Swiss-Prot record, chain B:
It is a peripheral membrane protein. This is Energy-coupling factor transporter ATP-binding protein EcfA2. It comes from Leuconostoc mesenteroides subsp. mesenteroides (strain ATCC 8293 / DSM 20343 / BCRC 11652 / CCM 1803 / JCM 6124 / NCDO 523 / NBRC 100496 / NCIMB 8023 / NCTC 12954 / NRRL B-1118 / 37Y). NCBIfam families: ECF_ATPase_2. The active site is at residue 171.
UniProtKB/Swiss-Prot annotation, chain C:
GO terms for molecular function: ATP binding; ATP hydrolysis activity; ATPase-coupled transmembrane transporter activity. The lineage of its organism: Bacteria, Bacillati, Bacillota, Bacilli, Lactobacillales. Belongs to the ABC transporter superfamily. Energy-coupling factor EcfA family. Gene3D superfamilies: P-loop containing nucleotide triphosphate hydrolases (3.40.50.300). It comes from Leuconostoc mesenteroides subsp. mesenteroides (strain ATCC 8293 / DSM 20343 / BCRC 11652 / CCM 1803 / JCM 6124 / NCDO 523 / NBRC 100496 / NCIMB 8023 / NCTC 12954 / NRRL B-1118 / 37Y). This is Energy-coupling factor transporter ATP-binding protein EcfA1. It comes from the Bacteria. The active site is at residue 163. Forms a stable energy-coupling factor (ECF) transporter complex probably composed of 2 membrane-embedded substrate-binding proteins (S component), 2 ATP-binding proteins (A component) and 2 transmembrane proteins (T component). This complex interacts with a number of substrate-specific components, including FolT, PanT and RibU for 5-formyltetrahydrofolate, pantothenate and riboflavin respectively.
Length: 267, 285, 272
């Protein structure tokens, strides 16, 4: 029921699950950055192999990763089609006005698709193995240096974790309000576009009002429990790197070195 | 004009890998012109059950027949409007559904959606507001300026305004103080007197014994008992434990007396009954 | 006798209507006071005034001899814990443990000391097995017990429960009340408890009942004293607890105030 989480987290005990969330975030960024330099089938293959290894290490069925790709399917298709029909070059296979199917076009299309898929898969590894609040904690820790330029990292991070905690509740409430208004005859499926747009008001207003009331109540509760300055707080969940993280970083460096090696040697 | 559940089964996400069966083999009739209470512990399927009464949910297999309207799994959303005009549903904490600029506008929302002309909708709204004792001076105010109790009554009026024959209420007394609870029960009785078919979910057995004519007991997604409140509340205690329900307060009190060796002639369900029985004992001594 | 809370000449208006005018209330340390009134009587507003969430126009509020002012408000709050009515709107953490930790983080407890304090607080309310659960998997009663634990972890001298059971089902209400009774027994005079409610069966548990309507004190005394005023209670939108209403209807009544347990005992011995 209502399991549409933003990047669904699945609890588990794999090596990847146990990594520090910062390691996973940094790893995802590094992988994507490096992978985007890929121009040869060999580097794509190497990147794909790395992702497959990572997926195996999460000990989760591939079906879950496939589910992560499904929402992006149309976007991938759209980009692939663009590459397919609009890449200049020779030899040309089909020609119809501005549309041109060329061999370089086909190759580019395949490469674009692989890039998309690998990026999504890698991000899914992150969200599948890391609870949202750990991601928020990791972000707070990684963005700490920004405090020097007066970015309110502590406040933003607290806002993020509280907001995340309310996601399931807000989804439930949306369903309840929709049920209440549907019961009073609200319909999204009839009428012209203007009527349908107006139909959203009886859904949005109660949600907003509810959210505002919740914010007020929460603020009171937080104050009463001693909240004053977001920057003057200790932390219950302290992140610390372990030996697993060291191995993970070594693995990442290894991936990058071999990637660069392939690029230079197969040229 | 009764409601019939015929071999109804319901699962969330039926047909997918995440299917969650909730209701099993429901065969039950909700009688016309009476107040029926649906009771059962949290998770017994009561909310899922009542959402079949106005088509918010459709049976996965089986059918729900509401008067002459047949609800099956393949019915399209657009065909449900006529059902919802006849079955009004008041959810728990209904004040959360208020949205309009004025009280009157909010209460007119349902009638207008169901095709009333503006003047008729206004009249219907005013009638409904009077029915739930929301005074005229509040009609032009923003619903958000009202007290919690007033907001709840406005929300109820919002459902009554389309003049449904069947009214369903999910825990209508939740969060109300004693006075508010009394007023709520009076409204329910008023609906019955007006000839409506009323269904309500409640955790408060004292309310059930006060207004219900008929009781349906749910447990683990199925209907395990049906009858008048007196019949249900006279079942043995072991049964009550298995379905995780309580007796009305008077019954609980009498049970505690019985455990101390003071046994009454029969199980009282109302405070006045209990007092009368205790007084009669004294006279026989 | 040390006064836990002392309210003098309180004046407060809401929406241009006067709610409290010259309101006085003293609560002794270690007392369990039930503040009762129908919805809208002003009882919740009083709680917010005591905690400085609302500011009175006139009057003084002292908490354990410390005057509540703009400067002292944070220190005063450190002596009081409050559990609010809506179980979801006070649950800050992503899990039960995180929520209890929230208060500890605010007062800058060392990270290494937190797990123990969290465990202790959760054990008192019987929720330690739910430590890693997310709030949307908990019932209302469970969430309120977590709220109590979050408050207990800060070791307040006073706990105020503002209609903490109003949104719960009978089961949830019962578990919260059981937990409160256990708490009061465990901490005795060290804990001052103020329960704000409109449920008279809950009010029976207190040492003292204060009835409020329209910002005015209507009745103030022991449960025995207050529940003998059936007419006054009805006039103020309240009812008697079940046992007392029953006793009222009996031809042969007990000669003194009895709560439910005592009445059952009395009735059962009569029959033997």
């Amino acid at each position: 029921m209502n399991n549409i989480m933003i990047g669904r987290f699945v609890p588990g005990d794999s090596w990847i699950h146990r990594l520090d969330p910062r390691t996973k975030m940094i790893g995802t960024f590094i992988f994507i950055f490096v992978m985007l330099w890929s121009t040869l089938w060999a580097t794509y293959a190497w990147s794909a192999a790395f992702v497959v290894l990572a997926i195996r290490l999460t000990k989760q069925p591939f079906r879950l990763y496939w589910d992560g790709l499904k929402p992006i399917f149309w976007l991938i298709l759209f980009t692939v089609v663009l590459q397919l029909f609009f890449t200049p070059g020779t030899p040309v296979l089909l020609h119809a006005g501005p549309l041109k199917v060329t061999i370089p076009g086909i190759i580019n299309a395949i490469y674009v698709m692989i890039r998309f898929v690998l990026i999504i898969l890698m991000s899914t590894i992150l969200t599948l193995t890391t609870p949202p609040t750990s991601i928020a904690n990791a972000l707070e820790s990684l963005l700490k240096p920004l405090k020097k330029i007066h970015v309110p990292v502590a406040e933003l991070s607290l806002m993020l974790s509280i907001a995340l905690r309310f996601v399931p509740l807000l989804m439930d409430e949306t369903q309840k309000i929709m049920n209440a208004q549907k019961s009073r005859g609200m319909s999204f499926s009839t009428g012209g576009p203007i009527k349908r747009a107006k139909a959203i008001v009886p859904l949005l207003i109660p949600l907003f009002v509810g959210a505002l009331q919740r914010a007020l109540d929460l603020a009171n509760a937080m104050e009463v429990r001693g909240f004053q300055d977001a920057t003057q707080r200790t932390k219950y969940r302290v992140l610390s790197y372990g030996s697993n993280d060291r191995s993970a970083f070594i693995g990442l460096i290894g991936f990058t070195i071999i990637f660069i090696g392939i690029k230079f040697f197969i040229k | 004009m009764a409601i019939n559940f015929e071999q109804v089964n319901f699962s969330y996400g039926a047909g997918t890998t995440l299917a969650q069966p909730i209701l099993h083999d429901i065969n039950v009739t909700i009688p016309d012109g009476q107040v029926t209470a649906i009771i059962g512990q949290t998770g017994s399927g009561k909310s899922t059950f009542i959402q079949h009464l106005n088509g918010l949910l459709k049976p996965t297999t089986g059918r729900v027949v509401i008067d002459d309207f047949v609800l099956t799994s393949d019915l399209k959303e657009k065909n449900l409007t006529s059902l919802r005009a006849r079955v009004g549903m008041v959810f728990q904490f209904p004040e959360n559904q208020l949205f309009a600029n004025t009280v009157l506008e909010d209460v007119m929302y349902a009638p207008i959606n169901f095709g009333y002309a503006k003047a008729d909708a206004e009249f219907a709204a005013k009638t409904a507001l009077k029915q739930v004792n929301v005074s005229e001076e509040l009609w032009d105010k923003s619903p958000f300026e009202l007290s919690g109790g007033q907001m709840r009554r406005v929300a109820m009026a919002g459902t009554l305004a389309s003049n449904p024959d069947i009214i369903v209420l999910d825990e209508p007394a939740a969060g109300l103080d004693p006075k508010g609870q009394k007023e709520l029960l009076a409204i329910v009785r008023g609906l019955k007197e007006a000839g409506k078919l009323v269904v309500f979910i409640s955790h408060q057995m004292d309310h059930v014994i006060a207004v219900a004519d008929h009781v349906i007991v749910m447990h683990d997604g199925g209907v395990v008992a049906e009858g008048t409140p007196v019949e249900i509340f006279n079942k043995d205690l072991v049964w009550f434990k298995t379905v995780a329900l309580d007796l009305p307060k008077a019954g609980q009190f009498a049970e505690q007396l019985r455990q101390k060796g003071h046994i009454l002639r029969h199980r009282p369900l109302l405070l006045t009954e209990l007092a009368t029985m205790l007084n009669e004992e004294k006279r026989h001594e | 006798m040390v006064k836990a809370i002392k309210i003098d000449n309180l004046k407060y208006s809401y929406d241009e209507r006067s709610l409290f005018s010259d309101f006085n209330l003293d609560i002794d340390a270690g007392q369990w006071v039930a503040l009762v009134g129908h919805n809208g009587s002003g009882k919740s507003t009083l709680a917010k005034l005591i905690l400085g969430l609302l500011v009175a126009e006139q009057g003084d509020i002292d908490v354990f001899d410390e005057r509540l002012t703009v400067e002292t408000v944070h220190h005063v709050r450190s002596k009081i814990g409050m559990v609010f009515q809506n179980p979801d709107n006070q649950f800050v953490g992503a899990t039960v443990a995180d929520d209890v930790a929230f208060g500890l983080e605010n007062i800058q407890v060392e990270s290494s000391e937190m797990p123990q304090k969290i465990d202790n607080a959760l054990t008192i309310v019987g929720m330690q097995e739910f430590k890693n659960r997310e709030p949307h998997t908990l019932s209302g009663g469970q969430k309120q017990r977590v709220a109590l634990a979050s408050v207990l972890a800060l070791q307040p001298k006073i706990i105020i429960l503002d209609e903490a059971t109003a949104m719960l089902d009978p089961d949830g209400r019962a578990t919260v009340m059981e937990t409160l009774q256990k708490l009061k027994k465990q901490f005795g005079k060290e804990l001052t408890l103020v329960t704000i409610t409109h449920d008279m069966d809950e009010a029976t548990l207190a040492d003292r009942v204060v009835v409020i309507n329209d910002g005015q004190k209507i009745l103030d005394g022991t449960p025995a004293e207050v529940f003998s005023q059936r007419k006054a209670l009805h006039e103020n939108g309240l009812e008697l607890p079940f046992a007392n209403e029953l006793a009222f209807h009996l031809n042969e009544k007990p000669n003194k105030y009895m709560d439910e347990r005592e009445l059952i005992q009395w009735l059962s011995t009569l029959n033997k």
